[in-house]
Amino acid sequence: MFGRNFPFFNSIGGFYPRDSLDPRKPSGTGYTSKVRVRDKYHIVGFISSGTYGRVYKAIGKDGRKGEFAIKKFKPDKEGEIIQYTGLSQSAIREMSLCSELDHSNVVQLAEIILEDKCIFMVFEYTEHDLLQIIHHHTQPQRHAIPAPMIKSILFQLLNGLLYLHTNWVLHRDLKPANILVTSSGAVRIGDLGLARLFYKPLNSLYSGDKVVVTIWYRAPELLMGSRHYTPAVDLWAVGCIFAELLSLRPIFKGEEAKMDSKKTVPFQRNQMMKIVEIMGLPRKETWPGLVAMPEFSQLQSLAMARGHLNRQSNLEGWYQSCLKNNGYSPTSSAGTPGPEGFDLLSRLLEYDPLKRISAQEALEHPYFTTGTPITANCFAGYEGKYPHRRVTQDDNDIRSGSLPGTKRSGLPDDSLMGRAAKRLKE
């Protein structure tokens, strides 16, 4: 399925064969047996933990150059007894997809190691992520992310997404914490734990995973209970990320209603309301498939209760206010996203998934083809410095079988405390 000669956009706009992509990609990607992690890697420290397990920073040994992030999957645990009952569906998906995917804007897997019934995924190390970058620009004095940097980040993100979609892969969990950035300014789409092949699925995608995409980045068709969805769900998330890069805060910051004991998926009323407040009420005249959505009656109830029946889109007003508050020029220039930025944002945040812009179309949008040229290094021209990812020596034993089941926050950097650390609460 993942052809070795697939052509794709590179990060400066051309096409070239897939194999010529990135000579830095470690060779021998795949499963390695009877090899101990510490024989091949020096563990520098602990990065983060979640429901999946733990992530450590490491340096290669014996001629294996470079820095790596080692993801150790947690075995099932009951009390003090480790139960080796197999891997989660998320872990299996991530391993199988990352072993096949090969693109400069998708996280790069070096190898998979099995040691003492524990699975380790060894990735290239990335120093930053978009959540960390956004947080930095809110501290200590709020200052906007430079417009050329946003353009480069967004182009590289869409470039990687085009590759995934062309190879029939939906990411389904795009959010700032999952968009990684190397110290040289290369953007990588990370965390493919919810990714899914969508080429002629035997069952609807809904039947396998009823809840996908972190709530603030979840497309309206998912909120409306759609049983079948498309790559358009990822493009809506890109629109939300674009808006967040501009405003330094989530554009649709709703509260998630949790599933009940019967695992019934509730209507996300608060999140839908946050979208309606900016985008206006979706209408069947512009979204013909709306009336067939399982939660259509809930939407009507929300609109009547909140007085939103005649609410029109205020996205342009939000955009202009965002430009003004963050010091961007309202007209086209090197220092502003301009009207082209608004047009792209509005097409990414299109209610009807059939009308929503695709990754291919977005890459050809005037926002990218006019104005400031796109740089392969998103940090090019930026004189500031972003803090390094926090790596601690606490709990630094990668061999430890006792892995606490801490709540997965999606935060790859433990240094993001306070308000920013709460933003990705799921």
Curated annotation (Swiss-Prot):
Residues in the signal sequence: none
Region of interest (Disordered), residue spans: 390-426
CC annotations in GO: CKM complex; mediator complex
Active-site residues from the entry: 173 (proton acceptor)
Catalyses which reaction(s): L-seryl-[protein] + ATP = O-phospho-L-seryl-[protein] + ADP + H(+); L-threonyl-[protein] + ATP = O-phospho-L-threonyl-[protein] + ADP + H(+); [DNA-directed RNA polymerase] + ATP = phospho-[DNA-directed RNA polymerase] + ADP + H(+)
Subcellular location: Nucleus
The protein's assembly and partners: Component of the srb8-11 complex, a regulatory module of the Mediator complex.
Name of this protein: Serine/threonine-protein kinase ssn3
Source species of the chain: Aspergillus clavatus (strain ATCC 1007 / CBS 513.65 / DSM 816 / NCTC 3887 / NRRL 1 / QM 1276 / 107)
Gene: ssn3
